[in-house]
């Protein structure tokens, strides 16, 4: 076990330094050499031993954030004091207000030039978040009468794809005004399923994140 500790520490150091630089300079404006310069004498070979490219480093940073998000989703999913609809509203509010969201929009990765990152987001949405966290809540909502749908699996995917992809200013390069319009359409769609779960506070936060991205890109 001791022999594996140092490589793990090195990888964690690389990720921590890279994330800080992504925050300070933005992903697109941070080079591998910038990361090396902040690693206290580690060589380029040390980085490439753990990560094949800057894109791989970004994916690893994103994986860290996904793990934290999954913990939050599981905690809300497993609560016994909320209806299905209340859980969905709690998830949306908690997700958009997480401090790490501002970090992500500050890093501002270019999804158009990083198709692997976009695929990773889509894959996690469809294969992980929708079936493991949102679908159980949909089924609970149907059972307790707070959600109206005959297609819980598809609705779980649709809701997350709209929230994580279609409304994501980093993917569609949306301005604050465009984000507002998408938010309103998303709210109308949700209300059609009896899900009046969006509010003005969430809208203002989305506009704030869009503004952070537009300033950083």
PLM regions: where:
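Short secondary-structure transition hinges
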Residues: 100-146
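C-terminal peripheral helix-coil segments that are non-catalytic and often amphipathic
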Residues: 139, 143-144, 172-217
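Hydrophobic/aromatic residues within well-ordered alpha-helical segments
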Residues: 54, 61, 65, 69, ...
